[in-house]
Amino acid sequence: MTQTLVDEGSTVALFGFGITGRAVTAALLERKASVLVFDDSPSEEMSGIAQAMGVDLNIPNSEQGLQELIKDVDFAVPTPGLPENHFFFECMKEKRIPILTEFDLSAQWDQRPILAITGTNGKTTVCTMVHQMLKKSGRASALAGNTDTPLVSAIGNDETETMVVEASSFRLSR
């Protein structure tokens, strides 16, 4: 994880505007960062959500087009499902733009304990069990990651003591 903080005044390129992308965008905007959002094939729903959030949803037609748009970017955040061979990564590498993940951002913004569970099979089951065990023991926990709740959203709940995160390999590979 990089130690540089994304905060007010930072310009961030976010690639992928699904559930996690929208949550990361909201978290960045809340922290007064400028966000450039990209998606290869946005739906009408995504376009409407982006408009409501006050961000432009860009469709990069080429590596060259993307490089022009990211010339003033401080950081880049790919969403978990973006393939490693996508030209987004090569553009960021060429421009020497640090790539952060949702987990990196969450760790920068929140210091509460995170129990991250990974593996080939059984992640959801184990996460659910750990979450229930924590609740039964009186600890307020949140279930996040590959679930319906991105970690950047879960950290917004101040009552939560511990984050239980389902972290599959595509989330940890960056």
Per-segment meaning from a language model:
Residues 1-101, 105:
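N-terminal leader/targeting and accessory segments in enzymes
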